Design a protein with these regions (language model features):
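A general structural signal for well-ordered alpha-helical segments in protein cores
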Residues: 3, 16, 20, 42, ...
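N-terminal beta-loop-helix "entrance" segment that forms/cooperates
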Residues: 38-55, 153
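Glycine-rich phosphate/pyrophosphate-binding loop and the adjoining helix
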Residues: 4, 136-190
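Short beta-strand elements in bilobed, periplasmic/extracellular small-molecule ligand-binding domains
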Residues: 31-44, 136-145
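Helix-loop-strand module that forms the ligand-binding subsite of alpha/beta enzymes
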Residues: 53-133
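Cofactor-binding loop segments of dinucleotide-utilizing enzymes, especially the Rossmann-like FAD-
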Residues: 8, 38, 112
Length: 190
């Protein structure tokens, strides 16, 4: 199973990027997590651009989503919200209408912040957007609060409880992919 991990932060060595790398380390056998690093190549959503030609950064994101079995979002929180660059990427990936690269693609969300609540509002905002885009999403909310205290000096996720939560989330994502694939197969057979 191939999962595209999208880190919502543009900052180098961000907490979110470290958590995304930890998720790849914790992935169940047979699950490959590929890190997406093109968020900064996606222009602000503009329907005029969509009508002319899809920008190269958007085309790359769409192709990588379409080549994946699932998507993993790892997001920080800015002012009680998901980062604009991440929301912008979701907007582009869901367009044009009727051709969403997110529709039907299973997803899981991890939010992480140095604040105690672990960016839970950002995670909930992305979950809400995925409801609209038709993206089946794991119900488990993984919000890693005080993430700065849970990462080791080498960048690995050292906190056992956080590791267990991420591991459980990835197992549930794998189950969701199986369910979606089974439903699609049944629709084709009908």
């Amino acid at each position: 199973m191939k999962v595209l991990a999208i880190n919502g932060s543009l900052r180098k060595e961000s907490f979110s990027s470290r958590v995304a790398l930890a998720a790849a380390e914790l992935a169940p056998e047979g699950v490959e997590i590929e890190q997406y690093d093109g968020l900064d190549s996606i222009p602000g959503f503009n329907q005029d651009l969509e009508a002319d030609a899809i920008p190269a950064g958007v085309e790359d994101l769409r192709e990588r989503l379409e080549a994946s079995d699932a998507v993993l979002i790892v997001t920080p929180e800015y002012n009680a919200s998901a980062p604009g660059a991440l929301k912008n990427a979701i907007d582009w990936a869901s367009r044009p209408h009727g051709e969403s690269a997110l529709a039907g693609l299973p997803a899981a969300i991890i939010s992480a912040s140095p604040m105690p609540f672990g960016a839970i509002w950002a995670g909930q905002q992305i979950h809400k957007a995925f409801t609209i885009t038709g993206t089946p999403t794991v119900e488990r909310e993984v919000a890693i609060g005080k993430v700065d205290e849970k990462l080791e000096a080498d960048g690995t996720l050292g906190d056992e409880k956080a590791r267990e939560e991420v591991t459980a989330l990835l197992a549930e994502l794998e189950e969701l992919v199986g369910q979606v694939n089974q439903e699609e197969a049944e629709e084709v057979a009908a």
